[in-house]
Regions:
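Active-site neighborhood of divalent metal-dependent phosphoester/pyrophosphate hydrolases
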Residues: 1-12, 116-119
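Conserved beta-sheet core of the metallophosphoesterase superfamily
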Residues: 16-46, 55-156
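Catalytic phosphate/metal-binding cores of nucleic-acid and nucleotide-processing enzymes, i.e., regions
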Residues: 51
Length: 156
């Protein structure tokens, strides 16, 4: 899913954010470069939400700027539950992958937040995120047992 940082407009665009985002152009360029490589496929959505079914499980991918929590004591959990509930009313997802909050966590049983590849930085300080080393998330979906492993990948 696209992020909100490489947008070409001062504020988020909703109907056309895919065409106003440098990451979209990067994805299109990569898709063109690898167009003859049969082992690689790109799924470049025009929507903020992307769905991918694997082993009969529907996975939802989203950046996360859609979920706002204003630094409340409950943190991200309640607003995230509400967003997932609203989205599930349209398309039910078995699991959710979010990238925006720059902190690796599993805030709900059906959602994993990706860590920050660059690690703790001035933005993390400004938003009050807890210190974390540079990391990404890993989730294993087994064809028979479902989601079995959720773990950080340390990127130092």
């Amino acid at each position: 899913s696209r992020g909100n940082h490489p947008r070409l407009t001062p504020k988020m665009q909703f109907a056309n954010d895919y065409s106003m985002n440098l990451e979209t152009f990067l994805y299109w360029s990569l898709a063109d470069y690898f167009k003859n490589e049969k082992r690689i496929a790109f799924k470049i959505e025009q929507s903020e939400l992307s769905y991918l079914t694997i082993y009969g499980k529907t996975n939802r991918f989203f950046h996360g700027h859609q979920v706002r929590f204003a630094g409340g004591i409950g943190g991200l959990t309640i607003p995230l539950y509400k967003a997932i509930h609203r989205w599930n009313a349209n398309i039910k997802a078995d699991y959710n992958f979010m990238c925006d909050k720059h902190t690796y966590s599993n805030p709900t049983p059906d959602c994993q937040c990706n860590g920050s590849l660059i690690g703790y930085n001035p933005m993390a300080v400004s938003f009050g995120f807890a210190y974390q080393k540079p990391l990404q998330s890993f989730t294993l979906l087994d064809s028979k047992r479902g989601y079995t492993i959720k773990a950080p990948i340390f990127c130092e």
